[in-house]
């Protein structure tokens, strides 16, 4: 069972902890999909009951992260290091977006961060951007103005990015979730 949607770690942690504990104790595999932006104490509360953290990395430098996400990434990266040190099973998920992070340089920055900090990674998922929700904007009478910015990387680029991880020892790297 994967807790996802919105940000799980920003919900009522008493409820989330009890839900994870109940599911885990009933034998379910519990996964948490997170951006990592939460107090580490909240992660510690649920760590014993979570099988896998699906952990997003969207940008490696503070300025880019703040520009596109709205907050810097210091807490996110620190929490990732702590989760790994505490023995959590982690799948790194990289939403890959042209104009934001779909570059060889960014992928190498992620590889270097993971290696330099001895982050234990079970799997890397490169998630190509999609505009599946584009039609919802018209229903809200809003423009979907992302021309030239928020676009899906080519299949060739995604394969190149995957190979960067594989060549650096992250053999369980996949395109898609």
Residue ranges and their predicted role:
Residues 2, 9-138:
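Conserved AdoMet/S-adenosylmethionine-binding subsite of the radical SAM
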Residues 170, 174-177:
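Radical SAM enzyme core and accessory elements
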């Amino acid at each position: 069972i994967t807790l996802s949607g919105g940000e799980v770690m920003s919900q009522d942690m008493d409820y989330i902890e009890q839900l994870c504990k109940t599911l885990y104790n009933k034998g379910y595999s519990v996964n948490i999909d997170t951006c990592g932006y939460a107090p580490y104490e909240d992660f510690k509360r649920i760590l014993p009951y979570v099988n896998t953290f699906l952990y997003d990395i969207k940008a490696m430098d503070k300025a880019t992260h703040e520009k596109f996400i709205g907050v810097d990434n210091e807490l996110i990266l620190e929490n990732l290091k702590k989760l790994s040190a505490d023995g959590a099973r982690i799948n790194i998920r990289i939403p890959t977006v042209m104009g934001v992070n779909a570059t060889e340089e960014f992928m190498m920055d992620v590889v270097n961060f993971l290696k330099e900090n001895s982050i234990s990674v079970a799997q890397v998922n490169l998630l190509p951007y999609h505009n599946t929700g584009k039609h919802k904007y018209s229903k809200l009478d809003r423009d979907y103005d992302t021309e030239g910015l928020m676009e899906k990387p080519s299949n060739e680029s995604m394969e190149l990015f995957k190979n960067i991880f594989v060549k650096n020892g992250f053999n369980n790297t996949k395109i898609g979730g």
